């Protein structure tokens, strides 16, 4: 039996990238996984298919986790399918980099609505469903919150908020045996990184030069930490932020 046998996990933004990698890793350890996606049903169902083909259990549920009504429905469908919740991975998020003179209200609110408000509302609903035995909430932050590169003031502020929220919710939810921790990745090679043009060229070379390990990360560099935080291996760990950056300083 895997480390997460008989556990139920919701992973937001799990149709690709880091979220998909975490969803598959949790399922491989025995968890029943709710693969949340915002827009691409095909991508969500592809992740579910991969999990089921390897003997795991999963369903795909559409929800825009910046909207309360969608979040409520996400957890209602989780309860209907599996009857409970043990693990939440707050992975859904967006990033739009811009210098100060290009910041707009839309750029600010779109990122804060999903990366911060969405994370809070999702955590609120998850905490209602997690039972008296407790559980684990895992927030996906970013190494940018401490690296502070130029042109990331809005995105970096959302992820600094995640750092703070992680510690605060750990204190609020600790009496209910709900642990709250954060994983702050460095640059990870995902579909989004490729689409943004960061996976090749000078930007990638600069990150690789700054990395102690001399490379950017892959999704399977992040998922083992998520499994650890979801399992009883980390039963005395809460309120912590774990940087998984390949030594980016």
Regions found by a protein language model. Name each.
Residues 128, 171-175, 235:
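Alpha-helical segment proximal to the catalytic Tyr-Lys
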Residues 123, 158:
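Active-site helix of classical SDR
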């Amino acid at each position: 039996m895997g480390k997460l046998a008989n556990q139920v996990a919701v992973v937001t933004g799990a149709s690709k990238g880091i979220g998909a990698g975490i969803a598959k890793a949790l399922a491989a350890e025995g968890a029943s996984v709710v693969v949340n996606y915002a827009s691409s049903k095909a991508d969500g169902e592809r992740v579910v298919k991969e999990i089921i083909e390897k003997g795991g259990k999963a369903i795909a549920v559409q929800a825009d986790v910046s909207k309360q009504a969608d979040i409520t429905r996400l957890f209602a469908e989780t309860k209907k399918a599996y009857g409970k919740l043990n693990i939440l991975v707050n992975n859904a998020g967006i990033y739009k980099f811009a210098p100060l003179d290009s910041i707009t209200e839309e750029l600010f609110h779109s990122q804060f609505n999903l990366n911060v408000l969405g994370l809070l509302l999702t955590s609120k609903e998850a905490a209602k469903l997690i039972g008296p035995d407790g559980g684990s909430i895992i927030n996906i932050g970013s190494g940018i919150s401490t690296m502070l590169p130029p042109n990331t003031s809005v995105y970096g502020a959302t992820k600094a908020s995640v750092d703070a929220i992680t510690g605060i919710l750990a204190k609020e939810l600790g009496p209910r045996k709900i642990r709250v921790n954060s994983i702050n990745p460095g640059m990870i090679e995902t579909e989004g990184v490729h689409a943004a043009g960061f996976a090749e060229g000078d930007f990638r070379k600069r990150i690789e030069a700054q990395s102690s390990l001399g490379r950017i990360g892959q999704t399977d560099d992040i998922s083992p930490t998520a499994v650890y935080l979801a399992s009883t291996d980390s039963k005395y760990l809460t309120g912590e932020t774990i940087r998984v950056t390949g030594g980016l300083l």
